[in-house]
Amino acid sequence: MATLQECKVKVDGEPKLSKNELKRRLKAEKKLAEKEAKQKELIEKQLSQAAAAAATNHTADNGVGVEEETLDPNQYYKIRSQAIHQLKVSGEDPYPHKFHVDISLTQFIQEYSQLQPGDHLTDITLKVAGRIHAKRASGGKLIFYDLRGEGVKLQVMANSRNYKSEEEFVRINNKLRRGDIIGVQGNPGKTKKGELSIIPYEITLLSPCLHMLPHLHFGLKDKETRYRQRYLDLILNDFVRQKFIVRAKIITYIRSFLDELGFLEIETPMMNIIPGGAVAKPFITYHNELDMNLYMRIAPELYHKMLVVGGIDRVYEIGRQFRNEGIDLTHNPEFTTCEFYMAYADYHDLMEITEKMLSGMVKSITGSYKITYHPDGPEGEAYEIDFTPPFRRISMVEELEKALGVKLPETSLFETEETRKILDDICVAKAVECPPPRTTARLLDKLVGEFLEVTCINPTFICDHPQIMSPLAKWHRSKEGLTERFELFVMKKEICNAYTELNDPMRQRQLFEEQAKAKAAGDDEAMFIDENFCTALEYGLPPTAGWGMGIDRVTMFLTDSNNIKEVLLFPAMKPEDKKETAAATETLESTTAGPSV
């Protein structure tokens, strides 16, 4: 803000400000100076109290720290850091090595919730631990804490009469603030109003929180902060914890389901000389010792099929894939999939397995085959998704012809330039965007997305893809130009992809060569030729079916999340603004470099 003196002169030929504007600015300057002086006075007072607390173990506000809550976060951090430093100087360790917990907060609540109001079990002493979310004083000798952990809350009713000594009672309660992690040794009981509590004999500070914790009443709603500081999100928002519990249940269910079918869980490389197994753009890394580029895996498929060649008939893997593509509501550069390969099976068998797995999973986790989903967020329209088997099945080309109202060329001609031109013209006529290169496979994919996928609310198998879209799938046994492949769509999004595997090494090499031509034409997502895999096929791959499912998208449906970042603990985020980062660093340095008291 310009000072009054600055306002009295012309700058770069600009006219002087009016008298009223000068008065307004002078008044604003005075108000700002008063505010800064008041804040400085408050900081000095708090620093003085912090030093006094460490020396005398007593403060005027019973240790609740109400005035501290009025400070800005940086001031609060500075005061708290110096108070903790003072504890260390006085010989006390605010970060003890160990605190033995007898019973979890959840177990405590389950075991003692039947107590009657006013009960106090003095013959039972237990140890619990958790994070303080609220602190309330009722006079000088009774302080209440809300202790949270494991998604539950337990009240701590600290009374000087029950504490090991009044001096210790004052000392510990002066130290504690919202956000601190504490250990509590005490007796189960209930207040006269019926609030289940632990009545402490001793409280131990286990790890102080140096930052001002947002109040649960207001919560943490800013999505940028929630995703960048997931630890804070988990501290304040229990619904986030519940989402990741559901995610863990999904993975556990899949693993158990496949184990019972006799599948062997395996691990395959995440860095490869050649990226393969899917049509996608890979990440490139560099290996110093080998002096060569390596690719982060986009899919584990080729390794799995080589293991089936080796005689392991049923294999599966749950792990991360990496694709150097866009970030949006349903895509993250690294994501989790489950893939399995089953010898002596075809895509019809996998449709049945998919129905059993998904319907059973939804019923097991939610208690019903039907779920409610909000694709546009909690405030948007709600859809009911029914996972009751069997799922709807449609043939891709036949259904696309119906939706477009046109007769497409015979599928045996889909690899011709004439078909590509027809599809190109249809996309133009229907205003369907397709960035170059406008290959037949890409044009088909855009048309299917625009006209078929949008009809798939309940689980729907889109089957029998053209061969030009499926370089690793086996040709259809009765429909020339098509493959025995399906994709499962739910709420317009693909969650599964599977097919009868191509096991003819000559045909596989030919398709790889066609993919190489597409890559040379500018298609970054086309596949490389993998000679090692082709050689493995020459030893004989039995009739096999392969399947892949995105864990993240399934989790989105079962947790009613419309953004993939909600179901990833640490999603990919754009870097923060450099100026903001520098300012934050400068602030941190200034608060940590201050003198100790």
UniProtKB/Swiss-Prot annotation:
GO terms for biological process: basophil activation involved in immune response; diadenosine tetraphosphate biosynthetic process; lysyl-tRNA aminoacylation; positive regulation of macrophage activation. Gene3D superfamilies: Bira Bifunctional Protein, Domain 2 (3.30.930.10), Nucleic acid-binding proteins (2.40.50.140). The modification N6-acetyllysine is found at K88, K141. ATP binds at R323, N324, E325, H331, N332, E494, I495, G550, I551, D552, R553. The modification Phosphoserine is found at S207, S395, S590, S596. Substrate binds at G277, E301, E339, Y341, N497, E501. Its EC number is 2.7.7.-, 6.1.1.6. It is found in: Cytoplasm, Cytosol; Cytoplasm; Nucleus; Cell membrane. GO terms for molecular function: ATP binding; ATP:ADP adenylyltransferase activity; lysine-tRNA ligase activity; tRNA binding. The modification N-acetylalanine is found at A2. The keyword Nucleus applies. It catalyses: tRNA(Lys) + L-lysine + ATP = L-lysyl-tRNA(Lys) + AMP + diphosphate. Its main location: cytoplasm. The keyword Repeat does not apply. InterPro entries: Aa-tRNA-synt_II, aa-tRNA-synth_II, aa-tRNA-synth_II/BPL/LPL, Lys-tRNA-ligase_II, Lys-tRNA-ligase_II_bac/euk, Lys-tRNA-ligase_II_N, Lys-tRNA-synth_II_C, NA-bd_OB-fold. Homodimer. Part of the multisynthetase complex (MSC), a multisubunit complex that groups tRNA ligases for Arg (RARS), Asp (DARS), Gln (QARS), Ile (IARS), Leu (LARS), Lys (KARS), Met (MARS) the bifunctional ligase for Glu and Pro (EPRS) and the auxiliary subunits AIMP1/p43, AIMP2/p38 and EEF1E1/p18. Interacts with AIMP2 (via N-terminus) and MITF. Interacts with TARSL2. It is likely that the same gene provides both this cytoplasmic isoform and an additional mitochondrial isoform. Catalyzes the specific attachment of an amino acid to its cognate tRNA in a 2 step reaction: the amino acid (AA) is first activated by ATP to form AA-AMP and then transferred to the acceptor end of the tRNA. When secreted, acts as a signaling molecule that induces immune response through the activation of monocyte/macrophages. Catalyzes the synthesis of the signaling molecule diadenosine tetraphosphate (Ap4A), and thereby mediates disruption of the complex between HINT1 and MITF and the concomitant activation of MITF transcriptional activity. The N-terminal domain (1-65) is a functional tRNA-binding domain and is involved in the interaction with DARS, but has a repulsive role in the binding to EEF1A1. A central domain (208-259) is involved in homodimerization. The C-terminal domain (452-597) is not required for interaction with AIMP2. This is Lysine--tRNA ligase. The lineage of its organism: Eukaryota, Metazoa, Chordata, Craniata, Vertebrata. The gene is KARS1.
